[in-house]
Amino acid sequence: MRAAASMNSLARKIGVANPHQFALHFDALTGMNTQSSGKWRSSFNGEKALSTQQLQLLSRIDPEVFKRHEMGPANLWQAMWAPLQGLRSILSTELALWPTLEVLVAEFEGDLLLAEAYHEPLTIAHLAKAVALHRLVHELNARIIPVGIDGEGTYRAIRRCLDDTSVAAALASLGIFDDVDAELSDWLAGHEELASTPAAARWNALASRLDWIA
């Protein structure tokens, strides 16, 4: 996933549409001959990881490529795979805004429910935050110390983001929708009922936690 997202993101950045065009642009910039060898094709397809050497070469196009490759689009890789302490930066605005994790989780879910009600599109950033909150709540409860939050709504939040057409299109444009959907669907396995809870039921569940719900 990392390779496909990085390569497709770079292709978009320089305005090319496929691995062949990318190689031609890269070769013109660097004086190398990667087009004839098909050097980048398998990474575009997500079949082969990018090596450190390849990332160093790609940094000639985008100096931020190492960071983007590690963090992912809208910090999605960090949300999915970083240690728990790495999740704070994804949620820094929300952690500063809300007094407790319970309120933060409720406010985030409320925002998603409002977007759903008004047919507003979601983004990969919404998905990354949903994943980060899900991990934070459930891993704290399971591994460190119970935080007194059931986290039921986080299953639906992830599913809602994955099912959003704008999120799906954005992930597909990077060549990673199928892989991201498959991995996160595995996270939801066994909790499909929670992931598909009707919106009205979640509004009712949040009513006692959010004073703006009439």
What are these model-derived regions, one by one?
Residues M1-L29:
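A short, Lys/Arg-rich alpha-helix, primarily the initiator
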Residues D27-Q53:
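Recognition helix of helix-turn-helix/homeodomain-like DNA-binding domains
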Residues K48-P73:
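DNA major-groove recognition helix of helix-turn-helix/homeodomain DNA-binding modules
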Residues L50, V147-G151, I176:
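Helix-start/N-cap signature of alpha-helical segments
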Residues A74-A157:
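Helix-turn-helix/homeodomain-like alpha-helical modules used for DNA recognition
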Residues E152-G190:
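Glycine-rich, aromatic-bearing surface loops/beta-hairpins
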Residues L184-A214:
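Charge-dense, extended regions
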